[in-house]
Amino acid sequence: MRFTIIMFVVITLVVAAVPNIVFVVSRSVAWLRGRQLGYGWFGYATLAMTALWVMMFVYGMVWGRFECKVARVTYRNEAIPAAFEGYTIVQISDLHLDGWRGHEELLKERVATINGIDADLICFTGDLVSLSRAELHGFEEILGGLKAKDGVVAVMGNHDYLPYDGLPPLRSPRSKAKEIEILQRDITDRLGWRLLLNENVIIRRGNDSIAVIGCENQSMGVHSVIRRGNLKKAATGTEGMFRILLTHDPTHWRGEVLGKTDIHLTLSGHTHGMQVKLFGLSPGPLIYSEYEGLYSEGGQSLYVNIGLGATMPMRIGATPEITVMRLIRF
């Protein structure tokens, strides 16, 4: 809640400042030309923009972040083994459990929706928590209820390494490492998920098989503070197979996967779709080459899920997402 209040105040101040900055620049230009420029409409613009932002924020906080869409995607590739024709993967990402406190029943509904899909595999692509491993407490039974034929596989996101925890007080590196270790153990033992830490799991159907590779967070862009991925280690033993990579940050795809490996499909999250999309427009492309949906290049593909949760608890237009991906051979 403290983080929410701080961010709300900061953004409100920025929004209110925009017309005033324009006014100062305009007045300076007018002064240089020997003219006078009154405050006039700039004052009204300040009030209007601030009021609009507050209304949008309230909408995004009260309603927007609790909406949900099921995005159905067909992924086609001739390399998919015959036995995996029609294989269904549900991808979820970026739960940020601190934002679900007090809304447990709604999260149960999301789990019920996912279970109703009757997927072959559920993939979670990171950011279970926002600040602390303690956020998981009370959600174990709910998230442990996720069911798929081949179970739930997961990777860590940048927030799951708790880099934003402890200000103040600062945690010692040893204490932080212990907290991360406990969170990883809780994901495995309390949720029953298969957590892939630079490793892989082979899924078999008769004589056919596919590899699901899980890489620890390897950010190559604006959030490059967490770089623990070891793709070579994670992919060991999967050579020549149809391969699906789970990696939290989509910048990893262009940084180390695309054109550098023969990994067919990568699933990522992290961007939240920037949590804002108005009239089909998002600030995402200003920061990320790939920020939402399916991308294909040179026979390799990336899907970016925009998450079910939020860091700042509001979403405007960027509706929380459950992805249902069906594998089809050409």
List each model region and its residues.
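Beta-strand secondary-structure signal
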Residues: 21, 72-74, 324
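Short, charge-rich amphipathic segments
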Residues: 34-50, 74-81, 110-122, 254
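Non-catalytic terminal accessory segments
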Residues: 1-66
